[in-house]
Regions:
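Post-Walker A helix-loop "phosphate-sensing" segment adjacent to the P-loop in P-loop NTPases
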Residues: 53-62, 289-294, 387-390
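Acidic, Mg2+-coordinating catalytic modules of nucleic-acid enzymes
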Residues: 1, 95-96, 146-148, 346, ...
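Conserved P-loop NTPase catalytic core
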Residues: 355, 385-389, 393-396, 402-464, ...
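Electropositive, glycine-dotted interaction segments
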Residues: 88, 92-216, 220
Length: 653
């Protein structure tokens, strides 16, 4: 398969670089990795660390060295990379099999005081017990430059790259094939271009000859002045021109521009906004590298044909005993025909074994910069589509939920945050991997639908304390109580709408997998429907609590509250109406007592010592569901609904 025939980054570990200290950070890679977290949490440092290891940027002590590192603590980048069979110069002895990959582990260190870049390779069979150790006298791939060429190729797009730089890169990408063709034509003395350049040089010589008398007068005057100082010396002025070697690439770039059509209007790229320029850059980057890959594949195929032809010639000149020379000559003729067809632009024959090449690694900072929300969604789809290619991996840093899609296959989300306050506090990663979480039935499809309807769901990954709610009414009430009142909770919590009670259980699984502490409030609902049938939403109550207990067993702190029978009537309102979110918002905004009650509920969900809706003693004595049934029954009786079919006979619910 093609994805197994591309080098691929599997894991990256960074120590004592940028804001990352000696405790280090380990990032597991996937098709696409989204790095999230507050500013100065190490996201861009991760991208730069790969560039440092690959050698595309140089280690700068003042910029890259962790300020609090001790002198005996090296700055370090460790890569675990899949290096497929077929990539030359990396011996099989350095590879070990893991999850269908052939892994090579290499480490780059920068030690005080010189901070020279030193690479070592993990030998899987070294060490006292043969369980592996860092090799001391050799390394995979030999020379660093050779091994680096086998690694995935990084393409870095910074968040602050200016417009001029972007257009220059775009022009270079677009014109590179033409640059190559022009240089080939200039080096061929028989080409029209080479003859034209030679003609210009000849014309310059002719013009020089026509002005020879004037040149000689100047030469004599210079010589006379010079001999006045040094009588024994003479000087002559020789007029001529150096060979004309025009910088074709600069001439082309200075005269070229990219044009953007918008209906009937056509403008230069420099007249477009930053977002349009960045989006065009991503698109051209992908196309350029696909063309480059095609060129590499064709060159590799041609090299193989040339080798076959050379081998066949040798076997024909000195045939082994019993060899059918006529058959060899026919094979040689076919190989030469293939080479001729290939050089004429013919397609490469299909092969079950794709040639092995380094993959590409797109390192992009804050792709949301300067993009309209609609464009941001389109850009997200573009980047995820790019990551589906076996040639590409994408690692992005982002502060936008529009670029997070946790339910796309082969997606990893890593939140970087400091475990405590302080510039030297350790940075700890929380990792979510879409392929490692198991959903039941159509839960994943429901979550994908939720993500499409409301991309703000992905705010759960960005750092503040998430509170899960069923829908828009709770969201409106909570937002009114903290936004309109400018409550201190405004910067501490994120309200996440499930848009349906049945979505809460899979959302709890997401939180548990990502290891995020959270709060949850939902409706109790009635045990029965208006027709007397069992209410599926009542059954969800027990499922939700079971999921909450599983989250606690995984080490999370989760706080759980229930609205009896629903959030609208918890606020003192009527049963749900179509305008309930707006009504709830206005009600909480205008009623100070109600606003305070909602704030207290939110505070409980954030920091209460009681994590369950009921005390542990009450649950142990009576049971969770009997307590809930009792509360709902009591509410129904107090509100004149004791005989309502939805609430009676609850002992059988």
């Amino acid at each position: 398969m093609a994805e197994k025939n591309r080098s691929k980054l599997l894991r990256l570990t960074v120590r004592n670089i940028g804001c990352i200290g000696d405790e280090g950070i380990e990032i597991e890679l996937d098709n696409i990795v989204c790095l999230v977290g507050k500013n100065n949490a190490g996201k861009s440092t991760i991208l730069r660390a790969y560039e440092l290891a690959k050698g595309t940027v140089t280690f700068d002590v003042h910029r890259d060295r962790h300020q609090h590192a001790q002198e005996d603590q090296p700055s370090e980048v460790l890569l675990e990379v899949h290096i497929p069979e077929g990539i030359g110069n990396v011996d099989a002895k350095w590879k070990y099999a893991k999850d269908d990959f052939l892994v090579v582990k290499s480490r780059w260190c920068w030690d005080a005081p010189s901070f020279q870049r030193i690479r070592t390779t993990w030998d899987p069979t070294a060490g006292p017990e043969g369980k592996g150790d860092w090799a001391e006298d050799s390394k995979a791939g030999g020379a660093d430059s050779v091994f680096s060429s086998r690694l995935p190729r990084p393409l870095r797009i910074g968040s602050l790259d200016d417009a001029a730089k972007t257009e220059d890169m775009l022009l270079t990408l677009a014109l590179t094939p033409l640059f190559t063709a022009l240089e080939q034509a200039r080096s061929n003395s028989e080409s029209d271009l080479a003859r034209a350049i030679a003609s210009v040089s000849q014309n310059m010589q002719v013009l020089s000859g026509q002005h020879e008398e004037h040149f000689n007068i100047i030469s004599n005057r210079v010589s006379a002045g010079f001999k006045g100082v040094f009588p024994a010396l003479d000087v002559s002025l020789q007029i001529g021109s150096a060979p004309l070697v025009p910088k074709l690439s600069e001439l082309l770039k200075s005269g070229s521009s990219l044009r953007v059509k918008d209906g009937a209007a056509e403008t230069e790229l420099s007249q477009q906004g930053t977002g349009a320029r960045r989006a065009l850059f991503w698109s051209m980057l992908q196309v350029h590298n696909e063309l480059t890959r095609d060129k590499e594949v064709r060159a590799d195929f041609r090299k193989g044909l040339e080798k076959d032809i050379a081998d066949l010639n040798k076997r024909i000149v000195k045939p082994a005993k019993g060899v059918d020379v006529a058959a060899l000559e026919e094979e040689l003729t076919n190989a030469k025909a293939q080479l001729q067809a290939h050089d004429s632009g013919g397609p490469i024959p299909d092969s079950p074994d794709d040639p092995a090449f380094p993959g590409y690694l797109l390192l992009i900072d804050e792709p949301e910069n300067a993009l309209h929300p609609m464009a941001a969604r389109a850009a997200q789809r573009h980047l995820y589509k790019l990551a589906e290619s076996p040639d590409w991996q994408v690692v992005m840093t982002t502060h936008s939920p529009y670029f997070i899609n946790p339910f796309e296959d082969h997606t990893t989300i890593v939140r970087l945050e400091r475990s405590i306050e302080g510039a030297n506090a350790p940075i700890t990663p929380n990792t979510y991997r879409s392929d490692l979480i198991e959903f039941e039935g159509d839960d994943k499809k429901r979550l994908q639908a939720l993500q499409h309807i409301d991309p703000s769901f992905s705010e759960v990954f960005f750092g503040s304390y998430p509170v899960l709610v069923e829908g828009d009414t709770e969201h409106a009430a909570f937002m009114a109580s903290i936004l309109e009142k400018q409550h201190q909770l405004i910067d501490r919590v994120t309200i996440i709408r499930a848009r349906g009670k049945a979505i809460l259980v899979p959302l709890i699984k997401v939180m548990t997998h990502f290891k995020i502490d959270f709060g949850l409030v939902h409706d109790a609902d009635s045990p029965f429907k208006k027709n007397g049938h069992r209410n599926g939403m009542w059954t969800e109550n027990d499922k939700i609590r079971t999921s909450m207990q599983a989250a606690r067993q995984a080490g999370l702190t989760v706080r759980h509250r229930i609205s009896i029978p629903d959030f609208e009537r918890r606020l003192g309102g009527e049963e749900a109406s179509k305008d309930k979110p707006l009504n709830a918002y206005l009600q909480v905004t205008q009623d100070e007592v109600l606003a305070k009650a909602v704030q207290e509920l939110l505070t409980e969900l954030l920091s209460s010592d009681q994590h369950e809706p009921y005390t542990s003693e009450a649950i142990q004595a009576t049971g969770y569901m009997p307590l809930l049934i009792g509360d709902v029954t009591k509410w129904a009786e107090q509100n004149g609904l004791g005989e309502d079919v939805r609430f009676k006979n609850q002992g059988n619910a």
